[in-house]
Amino acid sequence: MAKKKKKQKRQVTKAIVHIHTTFNNTIVNVTDTQGNTIAWASGGTVGFKGTRKSTPYAAQLAAQKAMKEAKEHGVQEVEIWVKGPGAGRESAVRAVFASGVKVTAIRDVTPIPHNGCRPPARRRV
């Protein structure tokens, strides 16, 4: 059987950190400026299950894991794009700041409908 070639790590200096927060989970995706994924993590990949994935602490750990992996690819400067209404927004952004990379911008790219689809009915408990 032929030897497998080891995949070479791409060296990227500028990146975009996409933080997607929902009511159930937080996904942190680090991409280059073209949108190709360099590293990613979520509440589930850092070891949480169920409702604990939606906590700010899970979002913090996910951001730390993704940034650690991104730094191995040579990322030094990032732009943060935050999307969604979840609980992990603030803590994920703080974790990116604490990782030691230079943050150039923070953008909120949460999609807002201009009277699009009908939203789900409110819960009656």
From Swiss-Prot:
Transmembrane segments: none annotated. Gene3D superfamilies: Ribosomal protein S11 (3.30.420.80). It holds the Pfam family Ribosomal_S11. One of its GO terms (molecular function) is structural constituent of ribosome. PROSITE patterns: RIBOSOMAL_S11. The keyword Acyltransferase does not apply. InterPro entries: Ribosomal_uS11 (IPR001971), Ribosomal_uS11_bac-type (IPR019981), Ribosomal_uS11_CS (IPR018102), Ribosomal_uS11_sf (IPR036967). The keyword Oxidoreductase does not apply. Keywords: Ribonucleoprotein, Ribosomal protein, RNA-binding, rRNA-binding. One of its GO terms (biological process) is translation. One of its GO terms (cellular component) is cytosolic small ribosomal subunit. Belongs to the universal ribosomal protein uS11 family. Located on the platform of the 30S subunit, it bridges several disparate RNA helices of the 16S rRNA. Forms part of the Shine-Dalgarno cleft in the 70S ribosome. PANTHER family: 40S RIBOSOMAL PROTEIN S14/30S RIBOSOMAL PROTEIN S11. Part of the 30S ribosomal subunit. Interacts with proteins S7 and S18. Binds to IF-3. This is Small ribosomal subunit protein uS11. It comes from Aquifex aeolicus (strain VF5).
